[in-house]
Design a protein with these regions (language model features):
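Fungal secretory targeting signals
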Residues: 1-11, 15-71, 336
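Conserved active-site regions of diverse hydrolases
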Residues: 44-46, 53-336
Length: 336
C-alpha cells in the first residue's frame, strides 16, 4: 500500500460500514477504524469518508486489460489531480516501464471507478504507442490545501513536488503530455461549508504550478474542466437549491477562468501547447442515455448496472467515454 493510502480516524464506525457497502464486494480494503466521536456526522464527513474508502479499494472488479501491442515508440503521460484520476501510484516505488505502464500498482490500479478509469484507458486501451503513465493524483486533493483545506495528504502542489523529485530526470519531455484534472474538491469543499469557492486564489496557484512544470521543460498540456457534478452525482440529491445554485456558479467561474488563464499562460511561454478539455459532454451523454450504457437509471450507484461507483464518483462508462473523447480532443497536439 502506498504512503498516501491513508489509515484514518472515523467519526462513526457505522458511517464507514455504510460507505464500504457502496463499494464493489470484490474490493480489497486494509484500513483501521478508530471510533473517536459520537456526535452526528454531517453530509460532508460522509462523502469524505466514502471518498477515502473508495480511494483505498483495489479495483479488481474488472479484469486487467491487455496493454496495446501496437507500440510505435514510448510516450509519457503525467497526471495531476484527485480521486477522479487516481490509480494509487507512489513515485517512490516501482516506476512505469514496458509491460507495467502504471508502475505501481499494476493495471487497472487503485481507482474510485470500480475498475479502469480514464487514465487507465489512455494507458492501455486507446493507445497506439507504449504510454508510460506517471499518475500523481490523490483522492481528496485540492490545488493547494492552504487555499482550500482537505483531508488529502498530497494536493497538486505536493504532486508537482513529487514529479520534480522522482520523475523529472527520467522522462523525455518532448514526448510527454501533462494532464491536470483538479477542481472538483476546490469547489466541492466550500459547497459543503456553504461558502463560495475562492476561484481567483485557486487559479493563481494552479498556474504557478503549471509555470513550474513549464520551467522544467514540459510544453504540452491538457487541462480538464470541472464536470457538472452539482446536477449529476447522487450525493447532490436533496441538497439545498440555494447551495446548489452557488456551486453551479462556482463551477462556471472555475471553468471560464481555466480557459482565460490558459490563453495567458500560452502567450507568456513560447513553445507551450495546451488546451482545455471540456468534461461536460462526456458526463451529459452517459447520464442522458443511461440505458444505452447499461444502467437502470441515472442516479443509482455501487453496482454494475449503475453509472456511479459510489455517491460521489463516476463509474466505468463515464470514464471510458471521457477517455475516448479526450484522445480525439488532444489529437492535434498529442497522439496516444
Amino acid at each position: 500500500m502506498s504512503p498516501h493510502s491513508l489509515v484514518f480516524p472515523a467519526r462513526s464506525q457505522s458511517l464507514i460500514r455504510f460507505a464500504f457497502r457502496s463499494l464493489r464486494s470484490s474490493s480489497v480494503v486494509d484500513i483501521l477504524l478508530v471510533h473517536n466521536a459520537t456526535k452526528l456526522v454531517k453530509m460532508k464527513s460522509f462523502t469524505q469518508a466514502l471518498s477515502i474508502a473508495a480511494g483505498l479499494s483495489l479495483s479488481f472488479a474488472s479484469p486487467t486489460p491487455e496493454i496495446s501491442s501496437r507500440q510505435n515508440g514510448s510516450k509519457n503521460l503525467l497526471v495531476f489531480g484527485d480521486s477522479y484520476s487516481t490509480v494509487g501510484f507512489w513515485p517512490g516505488g516501482t516506476l512505469p516501464a514496458a509491460g507495467n505502464p502504471l508502475g505501481n500498482p499494476a493495471l487497472p490500479g487503485q481507482t474510485t471507478s470500480s475498475g479502469l478509469n480514464w487514465v487507465g484507458h489512455l494507458t492501455s486501451t486507446l493507445n497506439t504507442s507504449l504510454v508510460l503513465t506517471y499518475d500523481f493524483a490523490v483522492t481528496g486533493a485540492t490545488t493547494d490545501k492552504d487555499i482550500v483545506d482537505t483531508y488529502a495528504q498530497y494536493c497538486v502542489d505536493d504532486q508537482v513536488g513529487q514529479y520534480t523529485q522522482y520523475v523529472s530526470s527520467k522522462v523525455d519531455k518532448a514526448n510527454t503530455l501533462v494532464a491536470v484534472w483538479i477542481g472538483i474538491n476546490d469547489v466541492g469543499e466550500p459547497f459543503w461549508d456553504k461558502e463560495s469557492a475562492p476561484v481567483t486564489k485557486i487559479m493563481d496557484r494552479y498556474f504557478q504550478l503549471l509555470q513550474t512544470l513549464a520551467d522544467d521543460g514540459l510544453t504540452n498540456f491538457v487541462l480538464l474542466t470541472v464536470p457538472p457534478f452539482s446536477d449529476q452525482i447522487p450525493a447532490m440529491i436533496g441538497q439545498s437549491e440555494t447551495d446548489l445554485a452557488r456551486l453551479r456558479s462556482d463551477i462556471t467561474s472555475y471553468n471560464q477562468a481555466l480557459q482565460d488563464r490558459l490563453a495567458t499562460f500560452k502567450s507568456s511561454n513560447s513553445g507551450v501547447k495546451g488546451l482545455v478539455f471540456d468534461t461536460k459532454p462526456s458526463f451529459d451523454t452517459v447520464v442522458e442515455n443511461f440505458a444505452k450504457y447499461g444502467a437502470k437509471d441515472a442516479t443509482c450507484y455501487g453496482s454494475s448496472d449503475c453509472l456511479w461507483a459510489d455517491n460521489y464518483h463516476a463509474g466505468l462508462a463515464i470514464h471510458k467515454l471521457l477517455a475516448e473523447n479526450l484522445v480525439k480532443g488532444v489529437a492535434e497536439n498529442f497522439v496516444f
